[in-house]
């Protein structure tokens, strides 16, 4: 029976990348790892074997969708928390790219770089969650968003989360500092317990923000959908991955569905941020094309009758008068 922090039960159900670097030494291969009961079949393309083909495609889709969301956020120049939420999407893009490299088998399990790349992936996972938590404080206006204080606090907190998760993961995989592939309590606490606590705090803060400070209640729907997609992804991955994999003949597994649900959850984060963020149109006009395009020329009479000719303190210029070939060179008052 597995105890607290043991990955045996988790890895037998979910085909996680870290499962190839934790657990006892396998007699068949002589390497450390826990083999899942069922995982998606490999795809051979151009004499290259691609692991988790469907999941790899979803990582590419996630990268494309993240680029689109980043472009939309960047177009809102005066939105509250613009720089902070951009950091979240940049980190999610890095996490998706690293997951694509690992899940597709670009660096195969058992190779020397594999533990380091999985440690980087775990570091990005913790960094994304911490960045989301810090973004949750921006809406309360405890400090001015976009200032060096706000941006650097976000960067330092995110870097600290990445460093802790990376070092704990690498120490576990390499048997450093009293940790080992069979002593995974520290890894479990960092990856699962701390991240779950941060997500709970973020959701609680956003519900409080909407109910106490906003008149519109529609953002609660975005929060609800985000929670639903995230929880559904975790259930698919950790509870039903093997059953799904066996039911559809190894074509898909829980990792694919978890990747889809995580992408939908991130999209709900964008939708929620966009719904509670107002933009000053005076400063965002530059993002729209043809704002000053002249649709139709004014008639001659309307173009000459300008407000400047009606100024009580101004003098009429000869340019305000219609041109006449026989008129005198000087004004009548001279």
From Swiss-Prot:
<feature type="transmembrane region" description="Helical">
    <location>
        <begin position="159"/>
        <end position="179"/>
    </location>
</feature>
<dbReference type="InterPro" id="IPR022057">
    <property type="entry name" value="Chs7"/>
</dbReference>
<dbReference type="GO" id="GO:0006457">
    <property type="term" value="P:protein folding"/>
</dbReference>
<feature type="transmembrane region" description="Helical">
    <location>
        <begin position="220"/>
        <end position="240"/>
    </location>
</feature>
<protein>
    <recommendedName>
        <fullName>Chitin synthase export chaperone</fullName>
    </recommendedName>
</protein>
<dbReference type="GO" id="GO:0071555">
    <property type="term" value="P:cell wall organization"/>
</dbReference>
<keyword id="KW-0256">Endoplasmic reticulum</keyword>
<keyword id="KW-0653">Protein transport</keyword>
<feature type="transmembrane region" description="Helical">
    <location>
        <begin position="123"/>
        <end position="143"/>
    </location>
</feature>
<dbReference type="GO" id="GO:0005789">
    <property type="term" value="C:endoplasmic reticulum membrane"/>
</dbReference>
<comment type="similarity">
    <text>Belongs to the CHS7 family.</text>
</comment>
<dbReference type="GO" id="GO:0015031">
    <property type="term" value="P:protein transport"/>
</dbReference>
<keyword id="KW-0472">Membrane</keyword>
<comment type="function">
    <text>Chaperone required for the export of the chitin synthase CHS3 from the endoplasmic reticulum.</text>
</comment>
<dbReference type="Pfam" id="PF12271">
    <property type="entry name" value="Chs7"/>
</dbReference>
<dbReference type="GO" id="GO:0051082">
    <property type="term" value="F:unfolded protein binding"/>
</dbReference>
<feature type="transmembrane region" description="Helical">
    <location>
        <begin position="49"/>
        <end position="69"/>
    </location>
</feature>
<feature type="transmembrane region" description="Helical">
    <location>
        <begin position="88"/>
        <end position="108"/>
    </location>
</feature>
<comment type="subunit">
    <text>Interacts with CHS3.</text>
</comment>
<keyword id="KW-0812">Transmembrane</keyword>
<feature type="transmembrane region" description="Helical">
    <location>
        <begin position="185"/>
        <end position="205"/>
    </location>
</feature>
<keyword id="KW-1133">Transmembrane helix</keyword>
<keyword id="KW-0961">Cell wall biogenesis/degradation</keyword>
<feature type="transmembrane region" description="Helical">
    <location>
        <begin position="250"/>
        <end position="270"/>
    </location>
</feature>
<keyword id="KW-0813">Transport</keyword>
